[in-house]
Amino acid sequence: MLYGMIGRPTHCLLLRDENVRSTRLIPNFMVVLCALILTGAVGGENPRASAPPMRVVGYLASWGVNTKGTSIANLPAKHLTHVFYAFAEIAPDGSVTLGNRCVDVGACGKSASLPRVAGGNFHELRRLKARYPHLRLTISVGGWAGSARFSDAALTDASRRKFAGSAIDLFIRRWPALFDGIDIDWEFPVEGGLKGNVERPEDKQNFTLLLAELRRELDAQGKRDNRHYELTIAASARPAEIANLEVDRITPLLDFINVMTYDYHTGGSIAHFNAPLYAAPHDPTPEMTIDSTMRVFRNANVPAEKLLVGIPFFSRAYGGVANVNGGFLQAAPTPPKNWHDSDGDWRRLSVTRLRDPHYKRYWEATARVPWLYDASTGNWISYDDPESVRAKMDYVRGQGFGGVVIWELGGDDGQLMRAIAGEN
């Protein structure tokens, strides 16, 4: 946006839009005047820096490629700014390694060495980047099932150096110009992760130190390569787990934060929403909403443009739910016996339960999310559809957040991504 005492002159906007090609069409005095306005030399407020473009980050689960109808060549790259490849793992010695050597780079068999020219998914991702030069590719380390060794990796100066150095050696130096950054998905420091994860009270401080080491090494490599490498994290949406981050100290180290604003009621005993935008009337947990989560980060002085709101392309289901109020907030003793991940994403849901006459669609106007309920079985499903995604996008734009992050790209048939892009 351009601001000054003479408003927004059409010629200045033309100069900016058409760049140097237009200058020969504009009188010299107008070029000078535009330059003065753009530099703040003409009276009025100083010009405000334009906001960065909205980021649209999509996680790509390695195990879903070519198994769920997802191919890398057909990813909706024109609508994405970033693809986050999930996941790299932490080896027993604390170094970062591939999650699946065969799938990731085509190094199949126990004796296969890592190729200098990557095959597998990495090869396909390089081809995708060549077709879409704007697209940035990030390797994500950890995840829900891969966070057991983070606490040990972050524990000492030596372990942090080993973690950071090995990540950069493998994903930045070995295959140049493939990855543009590193994402840390530690679920979760201190407590709250998968049973069996190593957890320590000092994880809170050590996570900051681990990110600082990564930032230092990425910047050093970026200086050698004459470019910037991004560092991001995936952060919990739950207030208790956000409290286990030194938010004020990690924010300056990060390019942005992917807030996992979903799974709010996983493991709960009542039928509740996976990713409500706001609290529904009579909601006993009003703090478990997207808006409440984002307020926690904003109240910690995280710039809005560094925060990305999570949008799930998957559903959560409950079973044995009583037929009262369409099942919402009713006791949910068991999950549906036939429920599993591949059947619960939007891609499958849109052609199964949504077409099943036993399921009725409901809409909660305050929370801005739908649900499905089968009164004959008591099965209750919370999910996102194009209508709720559009509501989330309106919220993101209205609050000035930096964009959205999707888990995960293989769960869509195109409808949800078009809603994100404003095409439906």
Regions found by a protein language model. Name each.
Residues T156-I182, E213, I242-L253:
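An active-site-proximal structural segment forming one wall of the substrate-binding cleft
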Residues I37-A51:
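Bacterial Sec-dependent signal peptides at the C-terminal "C-region" and cleavage site
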Residues P357-N424:
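Extracellular low-complexity, Gly/Ser/Thr-rich intrinsically disordered linkers
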Residues F122-R126, A164-I168, K204-R215, I290-R295, ...:
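Generic structural signal for well-ordered alpha-helices
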